[in-house]
């Protein structure tokens, strides 16, 4: 199997959210797509172990925010690499409550939808929820939607382990070893973000050419917020 072929499939990046009672949930999704035009229906694939999956089953509703190409990586890390069971992902995040009672995130987003679940299917490790769009809106009419390819190539992020598109990092490393041998690359062991000295970290104001060892002691991963001790040299 050539695992590089999986990265040729195009995806967007979204924050899928829901609420059941007083419990809110949300996660980063790239497997989300429109399946019918009339009525407008969308499918999402959610890991069975995700806290949000339980809340969607309870509430029967979900919403999603279409992330901007200029999305704050910390927001992606917040919803993508932490569990809502023991962490309030919505603290400090701008959102509003939609018609169906779904918390809709507006930060770093260009548009949003709110859906009522019509069907669901169990597919191995994941559940596919199909929901009819009940309401939607634009947040940034001129903003560009964030693609997974941009997230991976520019922001150096990877799918978390529970994502349906997750590929074991050892298989990815086999593809990228040649490039890594030519540059200083340090990888976050939590989210697999890669710090490349030749590029620096423009998000945190780190200039290109800055060695990882010369980074400030308070520097953290721009994706998941892990400190320097969580990085290993590739």
Please report, for each region that a protein language model flagged, where it lies by residue.
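Short metal-coordination and nucleic-acid-contact micro-motifs, chiefly zinc-binding Cys/His arrays
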Residues: 182-184, 217-218
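Short linker/helix segments within small regulatory modules
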Residues: 203-218
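Short, non-ligating residues that shape and space the ligands of small metal-coordination modules
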Residues: 197-198, 229-233
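Short, charged low-complexity linear segments at domain edges
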Residues: 158-173, 189-207
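Basic, polyanion-binding surface patches
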Residues: 1-181
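Residue-level detector of conserved, well-ordered beta-strand and adjacent loop positions
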Residues: 17, 196, 216
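Cys/His-rich finger/ribbon microdomains and the adjacent scaffold used
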Residues: 213, 223-229
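Short cysteine-rich clusters marking metal-coordination/redox-active sites
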Residues: 188-191, 221-224
């Amino acid at each position: 199997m050539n695992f590089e072929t999986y990265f040729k499939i195009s995806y967007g990046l979204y924050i899928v959210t829901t609420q059941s009672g007083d419990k809110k949930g949300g996660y980063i999704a790239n497997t989300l797509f429109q399946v019918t035009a009339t009525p407008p229906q969308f499918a999402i694939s959610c890991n069975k172990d995700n806290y949000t999956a339980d809340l969607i089953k309870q509430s029967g509703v979900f919403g999603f925010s279409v992330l901007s190409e200029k999305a704050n990586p910390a927001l992606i890390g917040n919803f993508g690499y932490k569990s809502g069971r023991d962490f309030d992902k919505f603290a400090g995040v701008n959102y509003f409550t939609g018609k169906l009672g779904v918390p809709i995130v507006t930060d770093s987003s260009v548009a949003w939808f709110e859906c009522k679940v019509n069907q669901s299917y169990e597919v191995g490790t994941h559940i596919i929820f199909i929901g009819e769009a009940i309401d939607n809106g634009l947040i940034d009419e001129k903003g560009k939607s964030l693609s997974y390819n941009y997230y991976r190539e520019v922001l150096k992020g990877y799918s978390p382990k529970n994502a349906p598109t997750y590929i074991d990092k050892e298989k990815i490393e086999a593809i990228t070893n040649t490039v890594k041998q030519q540059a200083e690359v340090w990888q976050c062991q939590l989210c697999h973000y890669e710090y490349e000295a030749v590029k620096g970290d423009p998000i945190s104001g780190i200039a290109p050419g800055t060695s990882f060892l010369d980074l400030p002691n308070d520097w953290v991963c721009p994706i998941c917020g892990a400190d320097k001790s969580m990085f290993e040299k590739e």
